Amino acid sequence: MIAHWYVHWQNIDSSWSRLFDQHNEHRIALPRLIFFTDLGWFRGSWYFTLGCLFLIQLLHAMLLTKLICSALSCHAISRLMVGGIVVALMFSALQIRNLVWGLQVQFLGVFFIGTVALYFLLRSGTTSQTSHSVWKSPFLVGAFSCVAATFTMANGLLLWVVGMMFGIKNTWSVKRLLVFWTLASLVWVVYFADFQFDPALPRPWDTIHQLWPVVQYMAVYLGNPISPAWRECAIVLGLLGMISTLLLSLSFTFDRAHRIFNSHALRTLLAIVVFVLLTALITALGRIEFGVEQAMASRYATPALIFWIATCALLLSIRVKSRLILLGIRQIGAVITLSVIFSALTFQLKIPEIEQQFRLTRLAAAASLLSNVYDKSVLEHIHPRPPQIMSVVDTLREHRLSLFSMEIADLIGQSLEQSLSITPRDQCAGHIDQVTDLASDRNGFRLRGWAIDRTRDKPADQIIFVSEGLIRGVAFSGVERKDVEKHYPGIKRSGWFGYARVNPGVTVQAYALIHDNQSACLLNGRYRR
């Protein structure tokens, strides 16, 4: 995570002046404050950033629950049920990347701040309320939340559009509309001052003519969380959601007496749905060149789930005169609600598998970076442009940031005998099983094997590689080895995966770290390059 943005901000003290600098198409000033805090106080360890991720999602779930319970007029037991469902969806494994990757704090943040903005902007719904002073109402909280969302992620700009549309329909006073429009204009001017489009991405207006592919992208974007394994079904569900939003918006537009959308909660939920739909549109226009498959990325599950939570709440709570139409709306809402819940619960069963895959991917990337070996195929899983990571590794190592704050990072390049005590070989078991040269690094190679700490009857968590008396690389255990488990019952994940950097003609040996990583125990097998 740190490497993803640290390329341009290698000195915290000099970075404040660049807080609003462009990052791709975004200006992520608020997320950078979180990153700087993590970097300065927690040495880039992720703890603070991931804590913020959890808190943002929890607060968002609580606010959505409040809106839904208000719209449905829920009692105490019903509130608990609604809250449980919303929390389960907001922390669903469908959006796993957003919940475990620190950089995604901006992705979760913009939708939470957007909900807060719309909640306060639309809180004044009657003519008498709108006559109140602009400076003494929740309006200001909503307006400045729009500013915060804008400088969290680019789609925050859409809140000004949504806010203006709903403000006009909500009969804001001329004074309030003027203040909001002025602030919106100022923010847009500041945002696009010295703005540069990424040459690798199409301009949104250049892809408008691709109407059907854009619609398909939007449909997959919205429908994928309900049908993650069947794209055609996801398209149908996404189209259903888009049509529902269109019909609800038309009903809201012509509902002059507020008979259908008769509460602040209903209007806010509709505004949230429109905001997410516009986000899907802008995303489709900017990403359609990558193909419709790109809309299935797990990061998009967060706005899609918010979309369905709000849509289902609307379908289950709005009131119309025709009993037949009302029954149809309720049935559609119930079916979609059950489908979303079923999909989320089904996907939760995959959490152990997903967690293990993420863990191994990160450990492999950490081993590559700690060993100073460039394995492009592994680093692509944690960063879209692996060379950028290698360009900041020396800086991260020098300042002991992120993974270089780990104790094992200090061992690389050090003498084995001076850094660790050597224990008898009967205190461990293991072997180097496979060594693979890397096309992306001439002097680096990948090693696989297994290791067991016999003093504790458990896998040895960390392994080091030694040549010519110096520690040249590291590996981490966690790979399931059923063949080893046959000989050591109960020890499942003794397999390790790591890297070493050595010159041709030297021999490499592997040592398991035991005794709280204070001692090294030689494993069987050696490799001569």
Language-model segments: which ranges?
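Perimembrane helix-loop-helix junctions
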Residues: 158-189
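Juxtamembrane "helix-exit" motif on the non-cytosolic side of transmembrane helices
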Residues: 38, 69, 91-101, 191-199, ...
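Membrane-interface alpha helices of multi-pass inner-membrane proteins
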Residues: 133-152, 159-167
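Aromatic- and kink-enriched transmembrane "portal" helix at the membrane-lumen/periplasm boundary
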Residues: 80-113
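Transmembrane alpha-helix segments characteristic
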Residues: 81-89, 181-189, 260-287
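Intrinsically disordered, polar/acidic, low-complexity terminal segments
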Residues: 1-25, 39-85, 136, 165-167, ...
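Specific aromatic-rich, kink-prone transmembrane helix
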Residues: 85, 106-129, 160, 307-310
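Basic, ligand-binding patches in group-transfer machinery
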Residues: 410-529
